[in-house]
Every structure is written in C-alpha cells, then in structure tokens.
C-alpha cells in the first residue's frame, strides 16, 4: 500500500467525520466529504465548488490521483462532477475541491459531511514526442468515431 501524505484543513475531519478510508479490502476509492459551512441546495443545472477539508501530496511522479463521482449520486440523482474527472498531479499540495454539477431535473440537498466524490490513485506513464513523417500502417489507420462498428 502506498503512503499518501495528507493534511487535515477542516478540524471536523477526524472528529465529527471520519478520515477517508477504504470501505472494503477490494475498494479502489476513498470517499471525499462535502466540508461545507452549512447544508446547501444544488439547483438543476447549477455547479458548485465544494471543499473537502483535505490536501494531499502524492509525491511520486509515477502516480496521480483522480477525483471521480460516486456512482449512486449520478445514477439516482443526476449529481456528477462539473469537470467529469478531477486530475490531481503528484506535485499538487492544495486543498482537494470537488466541482459538483446537478444535471438532474430536481434540486438536490448536499448535507455537511456528505460523501460527495471518491479519490483513486492511478499509475502514470510520462511520454515524450518522437516526431515522424509517417506512421507504420495499421488496419484501423486514421478511422475515428464509429469506424469499428455501426454504433
């Protein structure tokens, strides 16, 4: 297991609300909580930047963190991330913020401390460009959207 340095920026974490933890041995994500000053209503079509009360430092350039939506919020309530995925670079040290978007048709109440997103560590491979005049030919070639089937 990789050690992830974290700072608690909101004193309610660790007291009123638990530190992020894996729910099961097979869990990939750590739940992030909405550390708002008060319960907030997110109207249809509205976006809101929500503090998590945590900052992290991954430190290893071979890793990055992703902030992803919680599947139940998106499926049941239309609550997703405003930027779809939040990418946290290994050298970022600021507070984790969640861009929350209500794409649903009804207002959604976000309670203080509610689990609003999840944090997942992923491996990163950095690449450099090797400039070429032509690519080796492949069966697909430059075929793009819809090229490999009718849907």
From Swiss-Prot:
Keywords: Hydrolase, Magnesium, Metal-binding, Nucleotide metabolism. Belongs to the dUTPase family. Its cofactor is Mg(2+). Pathway: Pyrimidine metabolism; dUMP biosynthesis; dUMP from dCTP (dUTP route): step 2/2. SUPFAM superfamilies: dUTPase-like. It comes from Pseudomonas fluorescens (strain SBW25). Substrate binds at residues 70-72, 83, 87-89, 97. It holds the Pfam family dUTPase. It comes from the Bacteria. One of its GO terms (biological process) is dUTP catabolic process. This is Deoxyuridine 5'-triphosphate nucleotidohydrolase. One of its GO terms (molecular function) is magnesium ion binding. InterPro entries: dUTPase, dUTPase-like, dUTPase-like_sf, dUTPase_trimeric. The keyword Cell membrane does not apply. Its EC number is 3.6.1.23. It catalyses: dUTP + H2O = dUMP + diphosphate + H(+). The gene is dut. This enzyme is involved in nucleotide metabolism: it produces dUMP, the immediate precursor of thymidine nucleotides and it decreases the intracellular concentration of dUTP so that uracil cannot be incorporated into DNA. PANTHER family: DEOXYURIDINE 5'-TRIPHOSPHATE NUCLEOTIDOHYDROLASE.
């Amino acid at each position: 297991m990789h050690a992830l340095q974290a700072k608690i920026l909101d004193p309610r974490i660790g007291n009123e609300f638990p530190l992020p933890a894996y729910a099961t041995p097979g869990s990939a994500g750590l739940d992030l909580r909405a550390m708002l000053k008060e319960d907030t209503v997110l109207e249809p079509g509205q976006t809101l930047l929500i503090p998590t009360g945590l900052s992290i430092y991954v430190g290893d350039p071979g890793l990055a963190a992703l902030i992803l939506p919680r599947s139940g919020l998106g499926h049941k309530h239309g609550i997703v991330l405003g930027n779809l995925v939040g990418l946290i670079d290994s050298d970022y040290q600021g507070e984790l913020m969640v861009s929350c978007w209500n794409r649903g048709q009804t207002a959604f109440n976000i309670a203080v401390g509610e689990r609003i997103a999840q944090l997942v560590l992923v491996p990163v491979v950095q690449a450099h460009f090797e400039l070429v005049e032509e690519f080796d030919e492949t069966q697909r070639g430059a075929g793009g959207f819809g090229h490999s089937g009718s849907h």
